[in-house]
Amino acid sequence: MDVIEIMRDAMSYPLANVKNWLVIALLFLINGILQQLAINYRNAYLTVIVGVISVIVLIVISGVFISIMRETFDNSSEIPMLNPIVNLVDGIKYLITQIIYYLIPTVITLILAFPVTGSKVNQLLMVTSQLAANTTNTTQIVNAIPQSLLIDVFVSIGIVAIFALILYIIFGLLSNIAIARLAETDDITAALNIPYIIKKIQSIGIGKYVYFIVLVFLVSFVFSLVSGLISAIPYVGIIIASFIVQSFAIVFIARATALIYMEG
C-alpha cells in the first residue's frame, strides 16, 4: 500500500464506521464541554476539578488511539468500541512512552548546553553585574556589553537550539513508530527498544516514512485550522470542534500510523 492509499484509507475509516466514531467523539464532546466550562466560569476550584477530569479523559482518548491501532493490526476495518478501563491503562502506557521519548532529547540538550553555552553565559552575567554596580540605567548597561560577547552568547545558544530541534524531530519520528510498537506488543519495554524502532523505520523505508509524516502533518494542519475557526464560534465553538474535528483527526491519525507501521 503506498502512502496516498494509506491516507485515503485512514480518511474514509471514520466515515465507514460512523456509529463507533461518534461513540469515541463523545469523549471529545465531554472534553470540549469541560474546556468551555473552564472558560465561562473562572473559578479556581472549578478549574482544578475540570483540569483533573480533562486529563483523565485525554488519557482515555490516548488509550482509544492504541486500541484503533491494535484493531488495524488484526486486519479489521472496524473502529473498536470504548472500554474505559482498558483504554485508561493503555492511555497511561501511551503517556509514559511519549514522556520517555521526549525526555531523552531534553536530557541530551541540557547536557550539551552546559559546555557549549555555560562559560559564555557566565561571562555575560559577570560583565552585566559589574556594569550594574556602576549604573542602574538598563540602556547604558546593554550598550556597554562587548558586542563580541553578545554574538558569542547568541551563537552558542543558536547552536544548542538547532541541535535540540533536530533531536526533537528525530525522536518525534521514532515515537510514532514506538506507539505503534506499544499497540502491537502491549509492552512499554518493546516500545522503548530504540534500535528495533530504527530498524522498523528502515524496513518501511525512510523516504516513504518521511513522506507519510509530511502528509499527516499537512492534513493535521488543515484539521487544526478548521478546528480553530469553529472554536471561534461563541459558547459552542470549542464543543463542536472537539466533537467533530478533533475526534475525526485522532481516529484518522491512529489508523494511518498503524497502516504505515504494517508496511515494515
Which residues make up each language-model segment?
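Selective recognition of hydrophobic, aromatic-rich stretches within alpha-helical transmembrane segments
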Residues: 44-73, 150-191, 227-264
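Interfacial aromatic "cap" segments that immediately flank transmembrane helices
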Residues: 2-31, 82-107, 154, 171-225, ...
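Outer-membrane beta-barrel domain signature
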Residues: 31-44, 220-233
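A cross-kingdom feature marking solvent-exposed beta-strand/loop segments within repeated
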Residues: 74-82
